[in-house]
Amino acid sequence: MAKLTKRMRNIREKVDVVKQYEINEAVALLKELATAKFVESVDVAVNLGIDARKSDQNVRGATVLPHGTGRSVRVAVFAQGANAEAAKEAGAELVGMDDLAAKVKAGEMDFDVVIASPDAMRVVGQLGQILGPRGLMPNPKVGTVTPNVAEAVKNAKAGQVRYRNDKNGIIHTTIGKVDFNEAQLKENLEALLVALKKAKPSSAKGVYIKKVSLSTTMGAGVAIDQASLSATV
């Protein structure tokens, strides 16, 4: 049997796996246990009351967190003409059409988000096998295929998170860093949950948000008492 590290022993001693923690208590505990030599991300897992096997119950979308994610995001935009100029002015690092597609095909992908104007999809469509497996393929459902590329760039830079349930009906995303304060992480989590509730499939029955858990990059997960969140959630 593998020997537990000091960090893992500390986590086991301090985290009650059956308890639902009040949000501020949970954040304080995660901060205490985040001992990695880098600033860890705070991640959330939301178990949804959906049947992920049914396409009409899948949940997918995007929302801008009020305090961002703490990450620096590099944006690539497929657009031409006025849209290309607007994307550059909004702060996109890479803007182009066939020239940008050539870079992607050559493996030059120094970006985190890809946005496209609708008229650019004839070019982007050729890149599906490259961008798709990396989760980078633009999609109108998450606002990355849009005629308003400037707004999409600003949203990406402002801390927009994209979400999609996995095969078990669980949403995984990031809501910030451990150096955010308790209020910032709480408000980011609440903003995400509000967005998820708005995206609830009409065919989903019973309890929709079944469980909410927070964890850090290298830490254990703690379950959140949803009653400790804002009444608007």
Curated annotation (Swiss-Prot):
InterPro entries: Ribosom_uL1_bac-type (IPR005878), Ribosomal_uL1 (IPR002143), Ribosomal_uL1-like (IPR023674), Ribosomal_uL1/biogenesis (IPR028364), Ribosomal_uL1_3-a/b-sand (IPR016095), Ribosomal_uL1_CS (IPR023673). It comes from the Bacteria. GO terms for biological process: regulation of translation; translation. Keywords: Repressor, Ribonucleoprotein, Ribosomal protein, RNA-binding, rRNA-binding, Translation regulation, tRNA-binding. One of its GO terms (cellular component) is cytosolic large ribosomal subunit. The keyword Transport does not apply. One of its GO terms (molecular function) is tRNA binding. Part of the 50S ribosomal subunit. HAMAP family: Ribosomal_uL1_B. Binds directly to 23S rRNA. The L1 stalk is quite mobile in the ribosome, and is involved in E site tRNA release. Belongs to the universal ribosomal protein uL1 family. This is Large ribosomal subunit protein uL1. It comes from Proteus mirabilis (strain HI4320).
